[in-house]
Amino acid sequence: MAHKKTYSQLRSELLARYPVGLTKGGVSIDDIVQLRLQSPYESHLDVARAMASVMRADMAAYDRDTGKFTQSLGCWSGFHAQQMIKAVKRLRGTTKGAYVYLSGWMVAGLRNRWGHLPDQSMHEKTSVVDLIEEIYVSLRQADEVALNDLFNELKDARAKGATNKACEEIISRIDGFESHVVPIIADIDAGFGNEHATYLLAKEMIKAGACCLQIENQVSDAKQCGHQDGKVTVPREDFIEKLRACRLAFEELGVDDGVIVARTDSLGASLTQKIPVSQQAGDFASSYIKWLKTEPITDANPLSEGELAIWQSGNFARPIRMPNGLFSFREGTGRARVIEDCIASLKDGDADLIWIETDTPNVDEIASMVAEIRKQVPDAKLVYNNSPSFNWTLNLRKQVRAQWISEGKIAEADYPDGTALMSAQYDTSELGREADDRLRQFQVDISARAGVFHNLITLPTFHLTAKSTDELSHGYFGEDRMLAYVATVQREEIRRSISAVRHQHEVGSDLGDTFKEMVSGDRALKAGGAHNTMNQFAAE
């Protein structure tokens, strides 16, 4: 996107072309100004370039002040993304620091042609590209609707003979309008194939608008959700080649500031598909192989037909191989492998951010790993998955209980261990309140102590849709009937100033009326007349 021109600049340029203020066909230059300001991006590739610059600026701001971390919610439709960003703008008065996360899990579970699938790269890869494009269409339409309202306000003011000062104030709001378009962090899973397949998919995702790609170090054809068992990682040189594929896609398309997130699943991954070939001591292959689970080859434990042996520390050893041919890592090596993964991705893979998939939300655990990584890469920054796969209530209450017992503040018998801590009776207890305070502070703490630049929740709109639909259905099909809808949905929309309560306006009905006026004038057949029931929701 070129430098954004102001209302006055565009109008002056058009007036030079059409001195009477109209085209030969009778179109007003004021209408052309409106359409151009409503659609400043020539393509979604233009969006990717602009949002990459936004993200780079945010990363630099975080380096100066860890309190300036960014956030996102995972969205499985353009409408979810649009409503999230509208809510942020209504709350903060700005979209600054708010992104959209595109979750591969939700694409698999909700946005593919084969039904609800697990997060195992089983869905068609084009679904990811389609969702990126859909999200940006929705965000850009939110801009069009909001700016159309401002232009209608300007037209009404002029029609009523408002002063120049009053009109200039509206024009100032048009020029200062902050777009709903924000960066997307898009999940490319493990690349959906080999390096070339990764590159081809990355290009399509970028052309759809993605300024940031997140890729993981699992085997593409054996990929699992990061919070499931049976994860299989690839050797580091293989993963670095996929990172390079993503970088080449950005470079080819001229997205110089494109951001790559390298995710490691090694903390919970106990298997590898292959043993890489080491060329010399200390290379990527040797540092990967050293963590394999092996057993010594002796006269009492010789090699059998078809078995493999590797040379380690001056002796031959047998790597433990599963019945499916996969090789096992030694137990307790996940943390060390994560640290090595992250350093390699940042130093040799040209990744910009790292993502460590964990099994519990523990600030101390993440911070300790980041401290080791920063010995090699001092400015290492993370994306952290505040995952719905964690039982947050139970985890935080258990952390508080354990700490208070170790400090002598409580006895073990004061609060139960395990799932009993989930009981609602502890919601208002001292321990429950402390756990909730830590939840409220969690993202601040992990960003300050563990280098987390971006906090996201992967699947919130999946769970929100399930919960809100259940809530409405329970009342509507129960005794409350229409009261259930009015009390739990419509009244809340009105009282919270949620623009979607005017659903016709939200999806662009007024945009259509405006365009009809542009081309038809008084002949326009408009939907927004006196008999439109949306008038019942007009702002007081």
Curated annotation (Swiss-Prot):
Residues the record marks as active site: C225 (proton acceptor)
Keywords for the protein's UniProt record, in alphabetical order: Glyoxylate bypass, Lyase, Magnesium, Manganese, Metal-binding, Tricarboxylic acid cycle
pH-dependent activity: Optimum pH is 7.5. The enzyme is stable when incubated for 15 minutes at 30 degrees Celsius at pH 7.5-9.
Catalytic reaction(s) noted: D-threo-isocitrate = glyoxylate + succinate
Top EC group: lyase
UniProt: Mg(2+) binding residues: D187
E.C. number(s) listed in UniProt: 4.1.3.1
Temperature dependence: Optimum temperature is 45 degrees Celsius. Loss of activity is 0%, 16%, 30%, 82% and 100% when incubated at 25, 30, 40, 50 and 60 degrees Celsius for 30 minutes, respectively.
GO biological-process terms attached to the record: glyoxylate cycle; tricarboxylic acid cycle
Binding positions for substrate per the UniProt entry: S103, G104, W105, G226, H227, N385, N386, S387, P388, S389, T458
Gene3D superfamilies xrefs: Phosphoenolpyruvate-binding domains (3.20.20.60)
Top-rank taxon: Bacteria
A GO term, aspect molecular function: transition metal ion binding
Listed pathway(s): Carbohydrate metabolism; glyoxylate cycle; (S)-malate from isocitrate: step 1/2; One-carbon metabolism; formaldehyde assimilation via serine pathway
Cofactor annotation comment: Can also use Mn(2+).
Record comment: activity regulation: In the presence of magnesium, inhibited by oxalate, potassium cyanide, manganese, silver, cadmium and to a lesser extent by succinate, glycolate, iodoacetamide, DL-penicillamine, aluminum, sodium, potassium, lithium and strontium.
Function: Involved in the metabolic adaptation in response to environmental changes. Catalyzes the reversible formation of succinate and glyoxylate from isocitrate, a key step of the glyoxylate cycle, which operates as an anaplerotic route for replenishing the tricarboxylic acid cycle during growth on fatty acid substrates. May be involved in the assimilation of one-carbon compounds via the isocitrate lyase-positive serine pathway.
Subunit structure: Homotetramer.
Recorded family membership: Belongs to the isocitrate lyase/PEP mutase superfamily. Isocitrate lyase family.
Protein name as it appears in the record: Isocitrate lyase
Organism: Hyphomicrobium methylovorum
